[in-house]
Structure formats: structure tokens, C-alpha cells
Amino acid sequence: MKSEINIFALATAPFNSALHIIRFSGPDVYEILNKITNKKITRKGMQIQRTWIVDENNKRIDDVLLFKFVSPNSYTGEDLIEISCHGNMLIVNEICALLLKKGGVYAKPGEFTQRSFLNGKMSLQQASAVNKLILSPNLLVKDIVLNNLAGEMDQQLEQIAQQVNQLVMQMEVNIDYPEYLDEQVELSTLNNKVKLIIEKLKRIIENSKQLKKLHDPFKIAIIGETNVGKSSLLNALLNQDKAIVSNIKGSTRDVVEGDFNLNGYLIKILDTAGIRKHKSGLEKAGIKKSFESIKQANLVIYLLDATHPKKDLELISFFKKNKKDFFVFYNKKDLITNKFENSISAKQKDIKELVDLLTKYINEFYKKIDQKIYLIENWQQILIEKIKEQLEQFLKQQKKYLFFDVLVTHLREAQQDILKLLGKDVGFDLVNEIFNNFCLGK
């Protein structure tokens, strides 16, 4: 698909910086640029060309570099030029105004990648992966998305498509040419093949559900009695005063949250209300929220006061009952002479021992997750569920009737949905919906 519209957009973040990149793609980019430069810009010759951007009065706007990508060897498959200018947004706005005046059009979100897909430069799976790569919350998701960008998901889906196509062809031979006995296939043979495909789809679906969880931050709940320094530890981990620190017991009445990055992974810390023991058993100062935080957390830090350390066995039993890994750490080591193992001083921000242990645990946690094949978008997961349901219906409907011309309709439906998943038979409404979620300039 070749568009007649020349689109441009800022591909870098819209604030003053060292430089900016303006992407410009379409059939007439050279013609338009030659109206606003003081040198002849041609499709031949150097891939990088230096020139001045000038206005109608030949007033200099900026000294720029043009990175030229000639069709079809460009990101969009069209002639594409990236204008590298100095990083003042005043300059960017002037250049964009000139492009607009000379025939360019502001690109919609994701329009460059949409053109790449429509021009056959990448598959729909790969195009979807581009946006997810930009938005990846941690290194593991980034690596998984890169597998899709490399085409591994397409290979899996192509195999499934070929298997379903083969099933449809075998059934159609039975329907259209019943006299050719040598070509007849037993229904039991078809069923076994369908069951194998269903199992493969189930694995992809289950993997994809895991990916949703991986987009959530790794949650750590800080648990302990009142005034053991939970809020101080939260502030030390975040390197900012997120929680109120006070000597008054029970100052934290609610769960205070904060996010930080640890070795490429997004961590959410939950500072909970102090848990106090009374005759009635464990009492939650923040009502039930502290214990809800334990249930939600991937890991618990059980914080004790090093000046009078005493573990609450009932609380530890609660961790184990909920199958929660937990670290026991002793805070306020600056107030004691004999140091405990796993001791810190949150107030003094002496928490290296804890951070090292967290880093090791989180690296091991994510290392256990296999970088398998995942569907990364909701629309993909909906389609693959439909494909699985059609194949299951193929097996289920045999209890009612065994007519091949009826049963094959379920395989044909699955066949069509696989084509949609591969982007080979997809409507423009879905395509537009997918790319509207992209950022500008991509």
C-alpha cells in the first residue's frame, strides 16, 4: 500500500535536549524538503547530508543532518528522512511549521509503524511488539517482546496455520470426492491432530496470561510492629521522604506505596500499618490492609527492632500459610553494640545488605520464568481463545452428528481467525485500533 500523504512527527521526547529527530515519510519528501533547504536534496548519493533549513525569506532556521532512507529500504517502506536538528523545541516547532506549510501532514500515533505493516515490512505480530518494547516495564518483558519482534511468534502461528489448513483440505477431499477411497481419512486421525493443536494453543494462552502478570511490578510488603522503622526503610529504598516518619506508635494508618527500579526491574514497596499483638491475637492497626498487603506481595520484609528483637511466631506462621517468602531484618543497628546478621539502619540509610539480598532474590525470581512464546496484546489473546474454542467445538459436535460438511465449518472458522492473527485477513478497524495506542513518531 503506497500512501499519497507525506507524514512527519517528532520522534524524540518533546522538551529541550541535546538534539531532536523529526521523522518524515512519504512519496514527496525530497520535493518538500527542497523547498526549505539551501542545498539540493536528492535520493541518490550520500545517506547522510548536512544542510540548512531555511524559510521563504531564506532566513536560517537550523543547521541539520538529514538521514536518508530510500524506498523500499526504510522503516515504512517509503522514502523516509530523519531530520536531526538542535534540541531546542523552538527550532522543532519552526521546522514542523515549514513542513506543514509545504505539504506535510502531522502523523497519527503509530502511523509510521502502521505503514511499515501495510507495506509488508513487518508482520502484525512484529508491529504490535514495537509498541510493547517501548512500554516494557522490566528487562524480562523486554526480552520476551524482542522474541516476537524477531518473528518467533509468527513462526509458531504459521505452523498452526499449516496444520489447520491440512485438516481442512483432508476433510474437503472426503466431502467432494467420496469415490476416491485411497484419499479418505479417518475421523479419529483428524481428532488426534486437532487435540495436538489444542494443546499447543493452551500453552500459548497460559504463557500469555503469565505475561500480563509480568507487566505488574514486583511487590514487596514491609511488615512489623509499630515504630520499628518501616516508613524509614521505605524512604531509604526510594531515596525520598514518601512516608511520614515519627516516634509516635502507629503513625502509618494506611498502606503507603512507592516504586523504584532495581537492576532493571520495577519494584513496588508497600509500607504497612504496624501490627500489634493483643490478647485477642493479631490486631491490624490499619484494619485488614496490612494482611491484604502480605497476600498481594511477591516477597515480605519482616522488620524487627534490633534494640528489643522478638519474632512473632504467629505472624511467621501467617507468612508460611500464605506461601510467602520472607526476609527477617533487624533495624536500628546503629543503636546496639552486638550486631545481628541481616541488620540495617534505615534512618542512616545503611541498607546495602538488604538491597544486595533483594537484588539476588529478584534476579532468581525472574530467571525462573521461561522466555517462551507469548501473545502480547489483548486482541491477540481473544483471537487465539476463539481458535481454540472452534477446534474444541469440532470435537464436541461429533456427539451430535458426523457429517464432514458440518464439522469442517469449525475448522474453517479457526482458519480465518488464524489469518487475522497473522495480519493476513484483518479489517482496517482493528488495524487502526492497534496503532492508535502507539506513541507519536513511531
Swiss-Prot record:
Keywords: Cytoplasm, GTP-binding, Hydrolase, Magnesium, Metal-binding, Nucleotide-binding, Potassium, tRNA processing. One of its GO terms (molecular function) is GTPase activity. One of its GO terms (cellular component) is cytosol. It comes from the Bacteria. It is found in: Cytoplasm. Residues 217-363 form the TrmE-type G domain. Gene3D superfamilies: P-loop containing nucleotide triphosphate hydrolases, Probable tRNA modification gtpase trme, domain 1, tRNA modification GTPase MnmE domain 2. InterPro entries: G_TrmE, GTP-bd, GTP-bd_TrmE_N, GTPase_MnmE, MnmE_dom2, MnmE_helical, P-loop_NTPase, Small_GTP-bd. GO terms for biological process: tRNA methylation; tRNA wobble uridine modification. Its main location: cytoplasm. Binds 1 potassium ion per subunit. Exhibits a very high intrinsic GTPase hydrolysis rate. Involved in the addition of a carboxymethylaminomethyl (cmnm) group at the wobble position (U34) of certain tRNAs, forming tRNA-cmnm(5)s(2)U34. NCBIfam families: mnmE_trmE_thdF, small_GTP. Homodimer. Heterotetramer of two MnmE and two MnmG subunits. This is tRNA modification GTPase MnmE. It comes from Mycoplasma genitalium (strain ATCC 33530 / DSM 19775 / NCTC 10195 / G37) (Mycoplasmoides genitalium). The gene is mnmE.
